[in-house]
From Swiss-Prot:
Its EC number is 2.8.1.13. The active site is at residues 99, 195. It is found in: Cytoplasm. This is tRNA-specific 2-thiouridylase MnmA. The record marks 124, 340 as: Interaction with tRNA. Disulfide bonds join 99-195. InterPro entries: MnmA-like (IPR004506), MnmA-like_C (IPR046885), MnmA-like_central (IPR046884), MnmA-like_central_sf (IPR023382), Rossmann-like_a/b/a_fold (IPR014729). Residues 94-96 are annotated as: Interaction with target base in tRNA. Residues 145-147, 307-308 are annotated as: Interaction with tRNA.
């Protein structure tokens, strides 16, 4: 068996299948590596075995060796423990970002290099370019499927060793390629949601690890209107799952989460979807990561996303002495959520990003006791 030049992360999905197929057409020695990131907990909801069988089948069709590695321990300590800690603190984390940084482009990359590979390839919708002496992370050609948001924590050494073979494809084209190539995953449904939760009920799953504590749901004036099953089950702007029935003297309209007081275990809601309590013009981040190793300048203009698939929002970024950033948006943003990722762009190029620490949304700022000043950025 020849040493593979490239190890492909085969997930059992159609995207990684076509990534492997494209590389196979080039004639270089390749191998597939399937990684298991979550141990079967006996719930019957784990899709890992089905995905592994599909990955084996794809490798068979393409005539490339199949390898398996169990990273469930690394995932638990590097991703899941952080996920639980963030929810316990009342924040809403993004485990996919951390998984890419801590597992897929760290432990997986190490495993591939141990097999003798020079580079790895994955089925992400993103692109890499080398310009100005630095590796650049670019959006995928399919804007609806672009995954650069989840890859913004990657650095130079990782990008230098990574290929994104499907980054220049539209999803519809990719499906057609998979069908014409006879890949067994060509009609497989895309996976959605948090990988380790799958199709399970989110509250039931989270309740296994974080004991729920019921508390009051209040309106912005502090009047009690209902009871919640646990404050960490909810995120800013959320409508579903509140189970607020008819409230005397209130319109029969939906309610939206506008604030969480973790210390008092109180959830605040409003019937205005675009409530002023959800609006923010500024945010403060934790320490930022820059794909090229440094920010473009101490202060610069660019666009930002504060959640996946959000339209680009023009903003001004001020880099702080501690490595964090403060961001001023040109227009108010709805439900910017601490714990989620701020990702910055210059056109198609992903500059980097950071975890959102605080915003100037009125209620969240009051509940957090934040010292963040909206006057910092003019």
């Amino acid at each position: 068996m020849s040493t593979p030049h490239i190890v492909v992360g085969v997930s059992g999905g159609v995207d990684s299948s076509v990534a492997a197929w494209k590389l196979a057409q080039q004639g270089e020695p390749i191998a597939g590596l399937f990684m298991q990131n979550w141990a079967d907990d006996g719930s019957g909801d784990c899709r890992a075995e089905d995905d592994r069988r599909d990955a084996v089948a794809v490798c068979g069709v393409l005539g490339m060796p199949f390898h398996f590695r169990d990273f469930s321990g690394e995932y638990w300590s590097g991703v899941f423990e952080h996920f639980l800690a963030e929810y316990a603190a009342g924040r809403t984390p993004n485990p996919d970002v951390l998984c890419n940084r801590e597992v897929k482009f760290k432990h997986f990359l190490d495993a591939a290099q141990a097999l003798g590979a020079e580079r790895i390839a994955t089925g992400h919708y993103a692109q890499v370019a080398h310009r100005g002496g630095r590796w650049r992370l670019l959006r995928g050609a399919d804007r609806d499927k672009d995954q650069s948001y989840f890859l913004h924590q990657l650095g130079q050494s990782q990008l230098a060793a990574t290929l994104f073979p499907i980054g220049d494809l539209e999803k519809s084209t990719l499906r057609r390629i998979a069908r014409d190539a006879g890949l067994p995953t060509h009609a497989k449904k895309d996976s959605t949601g948090i990988c380790f939760i799958g199709e399970r009920d989110f509250r039931e799953f989270l309740g296994r690890y974080l004991p729920a504590r019921t508390g009051e749901i209040r309106d912005p004036q502090g009047q009690r209107i209902a009871e919640h099953p646990g404050v960490f089950y909810f995120t800013l702007g959320q409508r579903e799952g509140l189970n607020i029935g008819g409230v005397r003297g209130r319109a029969a309209a939906p309610w939206y989460v506008v604030g969480k007081d973790v210390a008092s275990n109180v959830l605040y809601v409003d019937q205005d979807r675009d409530s002023p309590l959800l609006q923010s013009r500024w945010l403060q981040s934790e320490q930022a990561h820059w794909v090229t190793g440094a920010p473009p300048a101490r202060r610069f203009s660019c666009t930002a996303q504060t959640r996946y698939r959000q339209p680009d929002e023009p903003c001004t970024v001020d880099v702080q002495d501690d490595g964090s950033v403060q961001v001023h948006f040109e227009r108010p943003q709805r439900a910017v959520t601490p714990g989620q990722s701020l990702v910055l762009y210059d056109g198609k190029e992903c500059l980097g990003g950071a975890v959102i620490a605080a915003t100037d949304a009125p209620l969240e700022r009051q509940l957090a006791g934040s010292s963040f000043s909206s006057e910092v950025v003019a």
